Regions:
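C-terminal accessory extensions appended to soluble enzyme cores
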Residues: 108-197
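Acidic-enriched, low-complexity/disordered segments with a strong bias for Aspartate over Glutamate
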Residues: 23, 29-31, 101, 136-137, ...
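Conserved catalytic core of nucleotide-sugar-dependent glycosyltransferases
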Residues: 1-5, 32-139
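Active-site-proximal specificity loops/subdomain of glycosyltransferases
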Residues: 1-27, 36, 181, 189
Length: 197
């Protein structure tokens, strides 16, 4: 089910034809927003890095209680990029210096941005989960999504209660908007009011 997504991600290479070997390349899903201030923390000697991002579901400030952080946006120097999908699949974690058998992917940039997952109306979430390819992937979803979750009313109630809309054990809590959120959101609270708890 991932073939189409991986192909599309690798098509990013088409836009890199004129990139210089020392240019910084960043790969993100659309809902992963890198913090502009964190980009400055990337240094060329790192080769590769991942941005640790605050993880929110359904609303701009509804944060996952079990998994509040997400390793999202990837960055690397162009000359080290094999493919965009390869970069996306790199597993970043702190490894001891003696693990010479593994690429040392220790470069985790803190306060690296925001992952606004499923920032959609109940109607659009219903459409997504009825059609998303991952729901047929036995490694992502162990079972088919129960039909009891696939209706607008159920989705709306789960969102209001801070529960996962398809019945997984994850829960979400409102976080007060503060300087840890994007400046644009803070300055435009009124505009985004329907997306803020």
């Amino acid at each position: 089910p991932w073939i189409r997504e991986n192909f599309q991600r690798n098509c990013i290479n088409r836009g890199l034809i004129n990139a210089k070997e020392e240019d910084l390349i960043m790969i993100s899903d659309l809902d992963e927003i890198p913090n502009p201030l964190a980009i400055k923390k990337f240094k060329k000697h790192m080769r590769y890095a991942v941005f640790q991002q605050n993880l929110y579901y359904y609303k701009i400030n509804l944060q996952s209680e079990q998994n509040p952080l997400w390793l999202g946006t990837r960055a690397c120097i162009k000359k080290y990029l094999k493919t965009p999908q390869w970069l996306r699949e790199l597993k970043f974690k702190k490894r001891p210096f003696w693990r010479v058998d593994k690429i040392r992917l220790n470069n985790i940039i803190l306060n690296g941005g925001w992952h606004f997952c499923n920032l959609k109306s109940p109607k659009k979430l219903l459409h997504k989960y009825k059609n998303v390819c991952e729901t047929d992937d036995q490694f992502v979803f162990k079972n088919k999504i129960s039909k009891k979750f696939l209706n607008e009313n159920s989705i709306k109630k789960s969102m209001q209660k801070g529960l996962d809309i398809i019945g997984r054990s994850e829960t979400f809590k409102p976080i007060k908007l503060d300087k840890s959120f994007p400046v644009h959101v803070i300055k435009n609270k009124k505009f985004y009011s329907k997306w803020i708890v």
